[in-house]
From Swiss-Prot:
Modified residues (Phosphoserine): S116
Record GO biological process: Golgi organization; Golgi vesicle transport; retrograde transport, vesicle recycling within Golgi
Residue numbers spanned by region Disordered: 93-222
GO CC annotation terms, alphabetical: cis-Golgi network; Golgi apparatus; Golgi cisterna; Golgi membrane; membrane; transport vesicle
Entry's disease: A chromosomal aberration involving GOLGA5 is found in papillary thyroid carcinomas (PTCs). Translocation t(10;14)(q11;q32) with RET. The translocation generates the RET/GOLGA5 (PTC5) oncogene.
Name by which UniProt lists this protein: Golgin subfamily A member 5
Entry-linked InterPro entries: Golgin_subfamily_A_member_5
GO MF: protein homodimerization activity; small GTPase binding
């Protein structure tokens, strides 16, 4: 970016220099106007001609001063227009650095404008025409009549100054950016004024010889030669000035074009600079990212260096180990024959042990299958006995309920008889009381009649005796009724006693039946206990067998790993060794045999593991069946007999593994639910087996559950619900 800053600084310096040149041109404008006013003042020139005609010294000094003035004007024009380049400064401008520096920059008057090419061509035509006409007129004026030298030189100087003034004006107008058509009209008018003034000067100079005295011919010829020489010099100088002005205008045009191009370049460079700034920002961001990536790569490089050092260390250790292995290689080669023989013996022993293990496993499987069949037969027998007992219990319960109903009916009848007996007894007591009262009243009446006298007493006695006979007869009748009632009561008592005895007998028979049933249940419980103990024993045996199988499997796997390591060592030895083709073929054949035997052992181990898993599942199913049988038989007299009709016994709904295939193959939602329950049960069984085999998993599960409960307790104890004080209905 330094080159762009330098270019911008150079462009700014160029603009400052152009402004300074325009300011110096403006400062020189007043001097040119003063010269023009002096040349146009004809009366003063005419008066001075009379005083200075014969003074050649002051006249020559005046001419030299005019020439110096023209040179100064040329220098100022050069300084104002060609101020772009540093090396193009004139000595006159260099002699006035203080003046150029002291002039302020007229920023308010200086306007940079682009000019069209036709305006520039018109300006060049005007300048060329203005250069030729004054010189021609001066020559004509000199050839006419030998006019005074001072006047002709003055007019020539004035005519030579006027184009310079016009050129200064046009340069100023071009430098300030005024319109070209107005500048051309002004230059034409000024040129016409100059022609008129030159004509007037010629006429005045032509009229002046009448008034001025005639000098000597020698002085005139000398002055005329001086004037001609001076006019020639002035013409040459004017031509050079015109050429310089044209070159300066061309330079100014070129500088203007270069300035426009520079401005376009500056604008383009500014746009490029903004783009480059954006690019630099993006590049800086990329550089930052790259520095971060480099830092990460440096860290990775450091890590890789550390790893490289570790790898070098490992390489050194590996080389040392390789040397040690190479030293051992010879020993291994020597011991190879012995190792092969030992390996063959070990392999034979291993095969023998494996055959023995297979034989023991087959025996255990056969014994387990036999035990399983016996146990299934026992279970079927127990199931049949349990069904028979259940049927007998139901019949006994029905008989007991019938007898209980009969006893209740008899008790109701006894209660009715007792109530009737009580009512009859109460009636008898009431009747006895009534009879006693009647007898007492009769006896009182008899006594009162006995105390009476005469015949009347006899009649009354006969009447009373008759009444007494009637009462006795009634008494006899009441006694007979009482005896009948007493007989009925005795009969009812005897019937009640008979019924009570029959009820007692039936209750005793029912108790005996219940006792028999309880004895049978106790026997079933004892048999179930025996079966449970036998099942526990079988479980323990199976557990021992499983542990033995697991141990044998681990030992076989460890031996297989050892054999694999030995095989790998042998392979490495075979790769490192350069044996003959026969020995290599023998080793390859042996290696193939060992790999085949290894594959066979692995397949056998997989089959054993699958058989073991199936046996575990069968054992767990038997356990669940025993649990279901124990749960169904422990209910006593209140047994659920809903499954007797189907002949399958009671099934617990929460043990889905016990469902038969016919039950699981049922169509509809019931079969789907049973299938899902059985699959969940199998998964739970497998999970339990996994946790039983691997205690580390159990520990992790326990830790996880403890942490989960702890977290839940912490959340429940530390949670505070948010209190929303907003109004209801979302207000």
């Amino acid at each position: 970016m330094s080159w762009f800053v330098d270019l911008a600084g150079k462009a700014e310096d160029l603009l400052n220099r152009v402004d300074q040149g325009a300011a110096t041109a403006l400062s020189r404008k007043d001097n040119a106007s003063n010269i023009y006013s002096k040349n146009t003042d004809y009366t003063e020139l005419h008066q001075q001609n009379t005083d200075l005609i014969y003074q050649t010294g002051p006249k020559s000094t005046y001419i030299s001063s005019a020439a110096d003035n023209i040179r100064n004007q040329k220098a100022t024009i050069l300084a104002g227009t060609a101020n772009v380049k540093v090396g193009s400064r004139t000595p006159v401008e260099a002699s006035h650095p203080v003046e150029n520096a002291s002039v302020p920059r007229p920023s308010s008057h200086f306007v940079r404008r682009k000019k069209s090419e036709p305006d520039d061509e018109l300006l060049f035509d005007f300048l060329n025409s203005s250069q030729k006409e004054p010189t021609g007129r001066v020559e004509i004026r000199k050839e006419k009549g030998k006019t005074p030298v001072f006047q002709s030189s003055q007019t020539s100087s004035v005519s030579s100054v006027n184009p310079s003034v016009t050129t200064i004006k046009t340069i100023e107008e071009n430098s300030f950016g005024s319109q070209t058509h107005e500048a051309a009209s002004n230059s034409d008018s000024s040129h016409e004024g100059q022609e008129e003034s030159s004509k007037e000067n010629v006429s005045s100079n032509a009229a002046c010889p009448d008034h001025t005295p005639t000098p000597n011919d020698d002085g005139k010829s000398h002055e005329l030669s001086n004037l001609r020489l001076e006019n020639q010099l002035l013409r040459n100088e004017v031509q050079s000035l015109n050429q310089e002005m044209a070159s300066l205008l061309q330079r100014s045009k070129e500088t203007q074009e270069e300035l426009n191009k520079a401005r376009a370049r500056v604008e383009k460079w500014n746009a490029d600079h903004s783009k480059s700034d954006r690019m630099t920002r993006g590049l800086r961001a990329q550089v930052d990212d790259l520095t971060e990536a480099v830092a990460a790569k440096d860290s990775q490089l450091a890590v890789l260096k550390v790893r490289l050092q570790e790898a070098d260390q490992l390489l050194s250790t590996r080389t040392e180990a390789l040397e040690a292995l190479q030293s051992e290689k010879s020993r291994i080669m020597q011991d190879q024959s012995e190792g092969n023989s030992l390996q063959n013996q070990a392999l034979q022993t291993f095969q023998e042990r494996l055959h023995e293990a297979d034989a023991t496993l087959k025996r255990e499987q056969e014994s387990y299958k036999q035990m399983q069949s016996e146990f299934a037969a026992r279970l079927n027998k127990v199931e049949m006995e349990r069904q028979n007992l259940a049927e007998a219990i139901t019949l006994a319960e029905r008989k007991y309920s019938d007898e209980k109903k009969r006893v209740d009916e008899l008790q109701q009848q006894v209660k009715l008889y007792k109530l009737n007996l009580e009512s009859s007894k109460q009636e008898l007591i009431d009747y006895k009381q009534k009879a006693t009262r009647i007898l007492q009243s009769k006896e009182k009446l008899i006594n009162s009649l006995k105390e009476g006298s005469g015949f009347e007493g006899l009649d009354s006695s006969t009447a009373s005796s008759m009444e007494l006979e009637e009462l006795r007869h009634e008494k006899e009748m009441q006694r007979e009724e009482i005896q009948k009632l007493m007989g009925q009561i005795h009969q009812l008592r005897s019937e009640l006693q008979d019924m009570e005895a029959q009820q007692v007998n039936e209750a005793e028979s029912a108790r005996e039946q219940l006792q028999d049933l309880h004895d049978q249940i106790a026997g079933q419980k004892a048999s179930k206990q025996e079966l449970e103990t036998e099942l526990e024993r079988l479980k323990q045996e199976f557990h021992y067998i499983e542990e033995d199988l697991y141990r044998t499997k681990n030992t076989l796997q460890s031996r297989i790993k050892d054999r694999d390591e030995e095989i790998q060592k042998l392979r490495n030895q075979l790769t490192n060794k350069t044996l003959s083709n026969s020995s290599q073929s023998e080793l390859e054949n042996r290696l193939h045999q060992l790999t085949e035997t290894l594959i066979q052992k692995q397949t056998m181990l997989e089959s054993l593991s699958t058989e073991k898993n199936s046996l575990v599942f069968q054992l767990e199913r038997l356990e669940q069946q025993m649990n279901s049988a124990s749960g169904s038989s422990s209910n006593g007299s209140s047994i659920n007999m809903s499954g007797i009709d189907n002949g399958e016994g009671t099934r617990l709904r929460n043990v889905p593994v016990l469902f038969n295939d016919t039950e699981t193959n049922l169509a509809g939602m019931y079969g789907k639910v049973r299938k899902a329950a059985s699959s969940i049960d199998q998964f739970s069984i497998r999970l339990g087996i996994f946790l039983r085999r691997y205690p580390i998993a159990r520990v992790f599960v326990i830790i996880y559950m403890a942490l989960l409960h702890l977290w839940v307790m912490i959340v429940l104890l530390t949670y505070t619900p948010e209190m929303h004080h907003d109004q209801p209905y979302g207000k």
